[in-house]
Amino acid sequence: MSLFDLKLKDVHTKLHEKEISVSDLVDEAYKRIEQVDGQVEAFLALNEEKARAYAKELDAALDRSEARGLLFGIPIGVKDNIVTKNLRTTCSSRILGNFDPIYDATVVHKLREAQAVTIGKLNMDEFAMGSSTENSAFQKTKNPWNLEYVPGGSSGGSAAAVAAGEVPFTLGSDTGGSIRQPAAYCGVVGLKPTYGRVSRYGLVAFASSLDQIGPITRNVEDNAYLLQAISGHDPMDSTSANLDVPDYLSALTGDIKGLKIAVPKEYLGEGVKEEVKQSVLDALKVLEGLGATWEEVSLPHSKYALATYYLLASSEASANLARFDGVRYGFRSDNADNLLDMYKQTRAEGFGDEVKRRIMLGTFALSSGYYDAYYKKAQQVRTLIKQDFEKVFEQYDVIIGPTTPTPAFKIGEKTDDPLTMYANDILTIPVNLAGVPAISVPCGFDNGLPLGLQIIGKHFDEGSVYRVAHAFEQATDYHTKRPTL
């Protein structure tokens, strides 16, 4: 049994009872990475020398009884769009292939303060644009459950690393489902917090009004510990909410008697595979058995979410990615004759096809003559989608449905059809547009591939999301299943 199969509090106990050391945990991470990452390809860069040195420091602190907090000594992986001081951060893009940040993102700083150990940086779709991690400029991450299948995206490396037992925790980012979808495909737990709950300072921006950093773990309890550690107001992020962070662990009571669940008919409609629907209905039976009730509801504007998202996210991306021009940092083309040519060549050679596609789509949507017809209208529809959620939450505690319409698909199956690829996020995108929190927890299998249950909560009510997710998890054994690598 791996140390990473244990819950965080059990690892914490073993550390303090001197049954294991921090160096043992770090050794376990790098040993497992050496064993399986040649197949899975989750990590882009390793922090081995510094991590081992830091582990020795923490072991000395443990001997002096100076260990603080439950994350003390725990190995963690970080998605490669979250900046890490002096540890290469590329966003899986050639244009940032040589970028070494000079500061830590706020979430990385918080984990350092909690004395967690950064093991390395994780692969992703380039600039978080994708649903399969096939858009990385460097490598294609595989699904640990079946190496011929994708792990999801854009946080595919983050989910695959946890599923493969390389690290117990990772950080991902979620703009339209990029934590929840790979968590579902890889059979792990992934939470997108409420927009503003976690600081975005140091997250390389894709779509600033949608991006949110969140935790990926093997179980709900550990997920709550990690969110507790990274949440809170940050003066460096103007969109960070100045609200107290509740004690998420106190929500994990297992008691959901009287809880009212809404199930949107749109989330079990056309395009959702029959096995996926059945897994959700089976999960609802489990929750009914625990004392909750559910009713079918409608989120009528969900059908417009995909188009709305791709207009808004691409528009924001076209502005955010303008900063990558070859002047200040990252890749610079050698084939230019003048400054303007250098801008063009750098971006043409540095960005991948999907990133270029979205920049062009966003630039078009923002252009004179099209702004009102596309961007402005999309913002209006976003408001309607948010109001749909608010209306349902007036009567219900949580919304439940599948995380994805299908299980993971084969590598290469959808790369030639961007619209089919985009449709993988049809059930997760509305949550980002509304800014509410949502989690994916394992709820079944289809031909050996994991399925995810999505639990959506009210603004800043991650506690209720965790309460339901934990109750379901404790009543089932899906979270205990491991891929054989």
From Swiss-Prot:
Annotated catalytic residues: K79, S154, S178
SUPFAM superfamilies on file: Amidase signature (AS) enzymes
Any Gene Ontology CC annotation: glutamyl-tRNA(Gln) amidotransferase complex
Keyword tRNA processing applies: no
Reaction(s) the record says it catalyses: L-glutamyl-tRNA(Gln) + L-glutamine + ATP + H2O = L-glutaminyl-tRNA(Gln) + L-glutamate + ADP + phosphate + H(+)
Gene Ontology biological process terms, A to Z: translation
EC number of this enzyme: 6.3.5.7
MF-aspect GO terms: ATP binding; glutaminyl-tRNA synthase (glutamine-hydrolyzing) activity
Main enzyme class: ligase
Family to which the UniProt record says this protein belongs: Belongs to the amidase family. GatA subfamily.
Biological role stated in the UniProt entry: Allows the formation of correctly charged Gln-tRNA(Gln) through the transamidation of misacylated Glu-tRNA(Gln) in organisms which lack glutaminyl-tRNA synthetase. The reaction takes place in the presence of glutamine and ATP through an activated gamma-phospho-Glu-tRNA(Gln).
The protein, known as: Glutamyl-tRNA(Gln) amidotransferase subunit A
UniProt source species: Halalkalibacterium halodurans (strain ATCC BAA-125 / DSM 18197 / FERM 7344 / JCM 9153 / C-125) (Bacillus halodurans)
